[in-house]
From Swiss-Prot:
Sites carrying sugar chains: 197, 204, 348
Function: Components of the endosome-vacuole trafficking pathway that regulates nutrient transport. May be involved in processes which determine whether plasma membrane proteins are degraded or routed to the plasma membrane.
Originating species: Kluyveromyces lactis (strain ATCC 8585 / CBS 2359 / DSM 70799 / NBRC 1267 / NRRL Y-1140 / WM37) (Yeast)
Membrane topology: Single-pass type II membrane protein
Taxonomic lineage: Eukaryota, Fungi, Dikarya, Ascomycota, Saccharomycotina
UniProt cross-references to SMART domains, sorted A to Z: SPRY
A cellular component annotation (GO) from this entry: endosome membrane
Protein name according to UniProt: Protein SSH4
Length: 542
């Protein structure tokens, strides 16, 4: 009977799978539908597949990280002085400022290609340019660049100075005393004003200014600085460059022309370790332009801005300490930037067009269409000059550097705070000594309006300072034949008597600050004084 009730209680139950159908023993239907079961199996298999792929990618990345270098790369892990550089730097070295093509040839191929390029480019240069190139090679051979990982150049003392002073701790190093006249007088190539403003003088031939500290390691995404072209003559006989470089850097070379340097040249050329012809990839600079350089820590990317607009990302995976550098050169001593060199440059299409228009107008019939050559090119650049025989004064160039002490033209740098640090550091701004805060003091202002009144006739805290006893001077003595004279008797007095009188007077002197005494004490003192005077007169007569 109970089995029949159980069967009636589950009329829709099916038999258990794998057993013969039994109408008596049945269970509830809790199985998943066929479509849902297929979806679940598909998801499980898909997750397993993705997990295996992720594991394979992790293994490949580990292998490339630790076992991807070959013997040739490991052989370059030491400098010429035998000191090793960290693993991190050489993993970032794959596209580190090698040349304008951003290629990474081997050491042998690099040397051979350099020899081929020297044989091609050096004959096109002036003797002055060739001399600079040879001096640069010798300089960096004797003093190789300090290629160190980012943030390793500074010691603990330098870091503390930067932390305390902030941007105020940065400044450009002064000019090297290498340019003198026939009398040995120093002719500075540039002046440093207000720590960060560099003015290149008329004595400049070719020089560069480097900052005392490298790019800082702050807690932002990037670090950024801007340089404003404060003074630069139109059609100038000089060029300048702005960029980043290692230390020590040849002081007689502009940035971008020596190893481990990158620069934005005023001609619009982008130079990366390139002393020869470079490509014109950027706008030409004029007076009032603002050039910016930034460095992103995460990717090691260097980017350039012009008048607040980002132009390009120049390099990637740069992981070394770089210094801010400014340089200028007198182009009259070069062939590259004179008329012939500018004609040979394939990027100077506008110059060739202006020169052809100049020749056409000057040879035309109408004199009103005459164009002065000074509007196209400086007269000093019409031919190559020799600095040893023909001295040409350089046009003055003034560049102002902004590390964050002022607002940036590049908006992103202001929003994300890419400055070198705080303006005054942890110490803060120094106190003001110009008197503006003092003038706002209410007490001092009230004192100026109502000067205090001092008592004149009343006996004040210090007593009667106007009494005759305290203000009278001792009687003057006249001297005759070396002996003091008595004013009353007009006779000489012996020195012994004078000494006795002096002692008596010293005892009788009252202090300058008098104190009121009782009347009895004052009367007795006057009697003693009269007795002493009578005694002294008797001694004199005797």
């Amino acid at each position: 009977m109970g089995l029949i009730v159980l069967q009636d209680g589950f009329p829709n139950d099916r038999p258990i799978q794998g057993f013969p159908s039994d109408p008596v023993v049945r269970v509830p239907d809790d199985t998943i539908p066929a479509d849902d079961a297929f979806s679940l199996m598909f998801l499980i298999s898909l997750s397993i597949t993705f997990g295996l792929l992720l594991l394979v990618l992790i293994l490949i990345s580990i292998y490339l990280t630790f076992c991807g270098g070959n013997d040739g790369d490991d052989s370059d892990d030491e400098d010429e002085d035998g000191t090793s550089v960290s693993f991190k730097f050489f993993r970032k070295r794959n596209s580190l400022l090698l040349d304008s093509s951003f290629m990474t040839p081997g050491k042998f191929d690099d040397d051979e290609s350099l020899k081929v390029r020297e044989a091609k480019e050096l004959p096109k240069m002036s003797s002055f340019e060739v001399e600079l190139y040879e001096r640069t090679k010798e300089f960096q051979k004797m003093s190789p660049p300090m290629v160190k990982p980012l943030g390793s150049f500074l010691n603990s003392q330098d870091k503390q100075v930067i932390k305390d002073r902030g941007i105020q701790s940065y400044f450009f190093l002064p000019s090297i005393n290498d340019n003198v006249d026939i009398n040995g007088a120093f002719l500075p190539s540039f002046f440093v004003e207000d720590k960060l403003n560099v003015s290149f003088t008329k004595f400049n031939i070719s020089s560069s200014a480097i900052m005392n500290y490298p790019l800082p390691m702050n807690k932002k995404d990037a670090v950024y600085f801007e340089v404003k072209v404060y003074k630069f003559k139109t059609c100038s006989n000089s060029i300048f460059s702005i960029g980043l470089m290692t230390c020590p850097y040849p002081y007689f070379r502009i940035p971008g022309t020596a190893a481990y340097s990158i620069a934005y040249e005023s001609t619009g050329k982008l130079r990366i370790n390139n002393a020869f012809g470079a490509d014109t990839l950027l706008p030409k600079l004029e007076e009032g332009d603002v050039v910016g350089f930034g460095y992103r820590y995460s990717s090691g990317t260097i980017f350039i801005t012009h008048n607040g607009k980002k132009m390009m990302d120049v390099t990637h995976k740069v992981g070394i300490d770089l210094f801010v550098g400014l340089g200028a050169m007198n182009a009259a001593y070069t062939r590259t930037y004179t008329k012939d060199g500018l004609f040979e440059d394939p990027d100077n299409v506008s110059f060739r067009q202006k020169w052809s228009e100049l020749q056409a107008f000057n040879n035309g019939e109408s004199s009103s269409d005459y164009i002065d050559a000074r509007n196209v090119i400086s007269k000093d650049l019409l031919q190559v000059h020799d600095p040893k025989e023909d001295t040409v004064s350089s046009d003055n160039i003034e560049l102002h550097v902004n590390l964050g002490q002022l607002g940036f033209v590049f908006i992103e740098a202001n929003v994300k705070k890419y400055a070198f640090g705080s303006v005054y550091g942890d110490i803060g701004i120094p106190p003001a000594y110009n008197g503006d805060d003092i003038k706002q003091d209410m007490l001092l202002q009230k004192g100026d309006e109502l000067p205090p009144e001092y008592p004149d006739d009343a006996v004040d805290f210090f007593g009667d300072i106007h009494s005759p006893a305290s203000t009278s001077e001792p009687p003057s003595a006249t001297f005759s034949a070396g002996l003091p004279m008595d004013n009353a008797a007009d006779t000489p007095v012996s020195t012994a008597d004078a000494d006795a009188d002096a002692d008596a007077d010293a005892d009788e002197e009252e202090p300058l600050i008098s104190v009121k005494k009782p009347a009895a004490q004052t009367h007795s003192k006057k009697n003693n004084k009269k007795k002493k005077k009578k005694k002294s007169n008797r001694n004199r007569r005797g």
